[in-house]
């Protein structure tokens, strides 16, 4: 009598890798045939929750399609394949189970936030109806949630440093899962499904901007190549702490984040490679700092587990009642990179053109939107969700809560000074000139404050404020301390009157936002 093969369906989501993948590892050990499955869930390609921005923008979609394509190639080399379907996972799985007839289990990695856990609940319900096993694992963090040195997730500290010290002294990182040279095969007769195109999602395939700091492709293969390059071929990891606040080029930071977001590389694998590098090459503050940043990623994921949907609420984790604004003209100026503050504008244009922005840039543009403009932080968070190639729900919302002063920042009223930050991290103005071509003829650090230039300097730079480049839509009093003073106009004088919140420059206070972008104003 022929015994039917045991088939296990492996639903892959943000774990698009073969290495250190407990879902595939468990299925390989417990099935005769396995079905790796990725679903293009239509719920990922609609509008965001509050402001209806597209959920998945062209840069991340491109990276996702590349990652899916790469994983399929890798699985084929191992004697398997990746099934691709368009549809809700719970419905696709139910159809597959009925089609195959001998599925014994469905397995997947758990996520932390509501939309993802809702999918898990729906898949579990489908498995219950069908009478098959539902098996989940936790594999997205460096430290496993069951190994945290806290009695319950509700005891997670609300300050990162306390969390970090606890896990570093009391926690242990689990070893990675090793995969065999060959995987169990797929059942016969299954259509593999084609990799969709941008057009299938009513989008255009974005061109690669030659200025981008992230000219990389998606996929596990590319992630592992990047690690090999950054660690072993160039030793760049040994100077990471000194270069991580860079703005231009590929190698100022690890650039692991996009691959981590889709699970193309495992944080535990990075950790193992750091340990190997420290034994064979060198151990210093820079090698430790890579782990330090991975712990931030862990922390925001565990914060999401602790607080649930509150990470998306207007009042944040601290339940603060802040009178946020929803001024569409101010927000448009921010997102389009035409605030008149060059450091903000350069970063926002880089994001729009490439899907990437440095960590330093993200902190600054978030501070500017929330602290200088007073705009609802969720507008910024959802805009990042749309555009970032490395969008990770927990890190994105955790960082925005932090920047807005309603998250895990132990310091009250942290506010970035756009001029000081720009001069500290782009003292020569090279980053400004790269992304704000209107200012290319302004030399040195003066590119950060074009409104402070004399009329002669502006004319020499072929710059007409209010026409070829806008005046700042707000001014913060503290900026004046960092401006290379030229013959001062009333803008500088008003800014030097004292500390306080950012304000519309006094002589234009009542003119409205349209004034700053009109080509016909009489200054």
UniProtKB/Swiss-Prot annotation:
UniProt key word Flavoprotein: yes
One example of a Gene Ontology biological process annotation: photoreactive repair
Bias (Basic residues) ranges: 496-510
Cited InterPro entries: Cry_DASH (IPR014133), Crypto/Photolyase_FAD-like_sf (IPR036134), Crypto/Photolyase_N_sf (IPR036155), Cryptochr/Photolyase_FAD-bd (IPR005101), Cryptochrome/DNA_photolyase_1 (IPR002081), DNA_photolyase_N (IPR006050), Rossmann-like_a/b/a_fold (IPR014729)
Annotated protein name in UniProt: Cryptochrome DASH
Function field: May have a photoreceptor function. Has weak cyclobutyl pyrimidine photolyase activity when expressed in E.coli and when tested in vitro.
Domain Photolyase/cryptochrome alpha/beta residues, every copy: 6-142
PANTHER family, per database record: CRYPTOCHROME (PTHR11455), CRYPTOCHROME DASH (PTHR11455:SF22)
Cofactor note: Binds 1 FAD per subunit. Binds 1 5,10-methenyltetrahydrofolate (MTHF) per subunit.
PROSITE patterns per record: PHR_CRY_ALPHA_BETA
Signal peptide span: none
Family: Belongs to the DNA photolyase class-1 family.
Lineage, broadest ranks: Eukaryota, Metazoa, Chordata, Craniata, Vertebrata
Gene Ontology MF term list: damaged DNA binding; deoxyribodipyrimidine photo-lyase activity; FAD binding
Claim: Flavoprotein is one of the keywords in the record: yes
Top-level division of the source organism's lineage: Eukaryota
Region named Disordered: 174-211, 486-523
Keywords in alphabetical order: Chromophore, FAD, Flavoprotein
A Pfam family recorded for this sequence: FAD_binding_7
Cofactor requirement: FAD; (6R)-5,10-methylene-5,6,7,8-tetrahydrofolate
């Amino acid at each position: 009598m022929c015994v039917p093969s045991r088939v296990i369906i492996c639903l892959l989501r943000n774990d698009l890798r073969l290495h250190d993948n407990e879902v595939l590892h468990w299925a390989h050990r417990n099935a005769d045939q396995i079905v790796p499955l990725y679903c293009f869930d239509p719920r990922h390609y609609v509008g965001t929750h509050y402001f209806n921005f597209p959920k998945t923008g062209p840069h991340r979609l491109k990276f996702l399609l590349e990652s899916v394509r790469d994983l399929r190639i890798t699985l084929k080399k191992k004697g398997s394949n990746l099934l691709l379907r368009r549809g809700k996972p719970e419905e696709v799985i139910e159809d597959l189970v009925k089609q195959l007839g001998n599925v014994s289990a469905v397995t997947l990695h758990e996520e932390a936030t509501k939309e993802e856990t809702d999918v898990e609940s729906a898949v579990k319900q489908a498995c219950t109806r069908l009478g098959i096993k539902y098996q989940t694992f936790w594999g997205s963090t460096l430290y496993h949630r069951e190994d945290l040195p806290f009695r319950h997730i509700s005891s997670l500290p609300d300050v990162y440093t306390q969390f970090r010290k606890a896990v570093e002294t009391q926690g242990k990182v689990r070893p990675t899962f090793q995969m065999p040279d060959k995987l169990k095969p797929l059942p016969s007769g299954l259509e593999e499904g084609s990799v969709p195109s941008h057009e299938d999602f009513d989008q255009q395939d974005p061109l690669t901007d030659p200025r981008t700091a992230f000219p990389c492709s998606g996929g596990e293969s590319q992630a592992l190549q990047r690690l090999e390059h950054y660690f072993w071929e160039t030793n760049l990891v040994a100077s990471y702490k000194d270069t991580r606040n860079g703005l231009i080029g590929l190698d100022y930071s690890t650039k692991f984040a996009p691959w981590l977001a889709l699970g193309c590389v495992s944080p535990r694998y990075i950790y193992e490679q750091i340990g190997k590098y420290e034994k064979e090459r060198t151990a210093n503050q820079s090698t430790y700092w890579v782990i330090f940043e991975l712990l931030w990623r862990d922390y925001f994921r565990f914060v999401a587990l602790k607080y649930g949907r509150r990470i998306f609420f207007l009042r944040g984790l601290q339940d603060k009642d802040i009178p946020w604004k929803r001024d569409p003209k101010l927000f448009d100026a921010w997102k389009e990179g035409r605030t008149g503050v060059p450091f903000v504008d350069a970063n926002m244009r880089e994001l729009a053109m490439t899907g990437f922005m440095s960590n330093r840039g993200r902190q600054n543009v978030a501070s500017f939107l929330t602290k200088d403009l007073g705009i609802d932080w969720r507008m910024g968070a959802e805009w990042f969700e749309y555009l970032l190639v490395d969008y990770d729900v927990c890190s994105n919302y955790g960082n925005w809560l932090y920047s807005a002063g309603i998250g895990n920042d132990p310091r009250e009223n942290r506010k970035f000074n756009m001029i000081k930050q720009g001069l500290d991290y782009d003292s020569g103005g090279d980053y400004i000139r790269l992304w704000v071509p209107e200012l290319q003829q302004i030399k040195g650090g003066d590119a950060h404050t074009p409104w402070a230039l004399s009329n002669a300097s502006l004319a020499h730079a072929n710059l007409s404020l209010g026409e070829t480049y806008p005046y700042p839509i707000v001014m913060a009093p503290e900026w004046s301390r960092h401006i290379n003073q030229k013959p001062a106009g009333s803008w500088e004088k008003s800014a030097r009157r004292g500390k306080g919140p950012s304000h519309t420059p006094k002589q234009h206070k009542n003119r409205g936002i349209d004034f700053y972008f009109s080509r016909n104003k009489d200054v």
